[in-house]
């Protein structure tokens, strides 16, 4: 028993004293699955939010590509109720890493994405509760997004994300621009 206890203490001591070894991060062909969420247009209301899932892959120069899907819900006040606008979009983009710390724990990236999807206003019901008719229609939407994202490695396989994103989408009846503030988590899968 003393032999195993000594071996355990020796291994833990070596592991804690070797503070100079850093994990290999942002290597080519690494893949990750991202879960994202956040607020829309600076609103802290739980009624205006976005959520999504994405797959990211790293390239040779520590940049990455991203492919994903996102759901965005924004409510517009109308008298004593609110009118929801929901967007379902697919994304394909590329992010450039432009800043990182020496320990490779924090990475700051800027990226551009192409977006396409569908927008529905009031879930397709154009007649409101008071008899008014909505002029906004459901439509296919397309456009792009610019994203500033901070990645913070918690472990070698778990990454916390914080981002600010500006989306511009044409084809819909309502505003074209949406600002998003979000958080997420990425799981490195290989």
Report each predicted region and the residues it spans.
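Extended low-complexity acidic/polar segments
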Residues: 123-164, 187
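Short glycine/proline- and aromatic-enriched beta-strand/turn motifs that initiate or cap beta-hairpins
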Residues: 21-74, 186-190
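Cleavable N-terminal export/targeting peptides
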Residues: 1-28, 190
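Extracellular loop and loop/strand-boundary signature of outer-membrane beta-barrel proteins
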Residues: 38-41, 76-83, 130-136, 168-172
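Gram-negative (and chloroplast) outer-membrane scaffold detector with strong preference
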Residues: 54-129, 187-190
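Predominantly the C-terminal beta-signal and adjacent terminal strand-loop region
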Residues: 72-74, 149-190
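Short coil turns and loop connectors of transmembrane beta-barrels in diderm outer membranes
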Residues: 3, 25-29, 61-63, 100-106, ...
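Residues that define the transmembrane beta-barrel architecture of outer-membrane proteins
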Residues: 29-31, 45-51, 82-90, 106, ...
């Amino acid at each position: 028993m003393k032999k195993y206890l000594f071996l355990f203490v020796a291994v833990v001591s070596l592991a804690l004293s070797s503070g100079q070894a850093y994990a290999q991060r942002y290597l080519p062909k690494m893949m990750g699955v991202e879960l994202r969420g956040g607020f829309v247009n600076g609103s802290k209301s739980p009624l205006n939010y976005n959520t999504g899932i994405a797959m990211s892959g790293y390239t040779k120069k520590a940049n990455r590509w991203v492919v994903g899907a996102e759901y965005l819900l924004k409510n517009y006040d109308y008298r004593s109720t609110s009118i929801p606008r929901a967007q379902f979009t697919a994304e394909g983009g590329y992010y450039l890493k432009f800043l990182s710390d020496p320990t490779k724990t924090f990475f700051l990236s800027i990226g551009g994405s192409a977006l396409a999807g569908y927008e529905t206003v009031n879930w397709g019901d154009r007649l409101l509760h008071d008899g008014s008719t909505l002029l906004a229609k459901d439509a296919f939407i397309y456009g792009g997004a610019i994203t500033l994202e901070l990645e913070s490695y918690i472990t070698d396989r778990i990454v916390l994300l914080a981002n600010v994103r500006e989306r511009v989408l044409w084809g819909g009846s309502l505003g074209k621009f949406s600002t998003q503030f979000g958080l997420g988590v990425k799981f490195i899968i290989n």
